[in-house]
A protein has these predicted regions:
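Extracellular acidic, Ser/Thr/Pro-rich low-complexity tracts
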Residues: 61, 107-109
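Short, intrinsically disordered, charge-balanced linker/junction segments flanking boundaries
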Residues: 15, 64, 161-165
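Extracellular glycan-recognition surfaces and repeat-rich motifs
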Residues: 18-77
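Terminal, low-complexity interaction segments
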Residues: 110, 124-165
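Extracellular beta-strand-rich recognition modules
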Residues: 28, 86-107, 115, 150-160
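Short, surface-exposed beta-strand/strand-loop-strand elements in extracellular ectodomains
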Residues: 114-122
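Extracellular beta-rich ligand/substrate-recognition surface
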Residues: 71-84, 132-136
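Bacterial Sec-dependent N-terminal signal peptides
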Residues: 1-22
């Protein structure tokens, strides 16, 4: 049995350089991953298809239903209150008007934890939202205008809930 905290990111990703060509999108079909925090409790993982535990996670990804999605596994030892953080590459958006972060997420399980989304710019970590608890068995679209920064990366910090269900 496991509880899943899921995320399908659309307008981001790739590593090794500063991204300055937009829109920048990824549906994880090319197995492009994000940068994992080496000091937290574990890594986000790629998954295809349904989760193996009843009443947790989606039946498939948002885009095709058969594609890949990024998620946190919270079966033992992934609970309680374990932190999993992943980062996008640095984005240089100084010449880009109308900066926006958008993605699809799925948080289904009775003991679901939290997903914190933050901007890191100039060494400052600024949370922009926290989504908490069981959101039901469906995908949701998140949309955040990004203001007052020209260079940044995004942190996705998942904190597992009180159990794996």
């Amino acid at each position: 049995m496991k509880k899943i905290l899921l995320l399908l990111l659309l307008p981001i990703f790739g590593f090794g350089q500063v991204v300055n060509t937009f829109p920048w999108t990824n549906d994880f079909e090319s197995f492009i991953t994000l940068q994992e925090d080496p000091n937290d409790n574990g890594d986000w993982m790629l998954k295809q298809g349904p989760t193996s535990s009843a009443n947790t996670g989606p039946s498939g990804d948002h885009t095709t239903g058969n594609g890949m999605y990024y998620y946190v596994e919270s079966s033992y030892p992934g609970y309680p209150n374990q932190v999993f953080t992943t980062y996008t590459p640095m984005f240089d958006v100084s010449a880009t008007p109308g900066k926006v972060l958008s993605f699809w997420y799925h948080m289904y399980g009775t003991a679901m934890g939290d997903l914190e989304i933050a901007i890191i710019s100039g060494g400052t970590y600024t949370p922009i939202d926290t989504i908490s608890g069981n959101q039901g068995n469906q995908w949701y679209f998140a949309y955040y205008p990004i203001t007052a920064v020209d260079s940044f990366k995004i942190a996705f910090k998942a904190t597992t809930g009180s159990s794996f269900t």
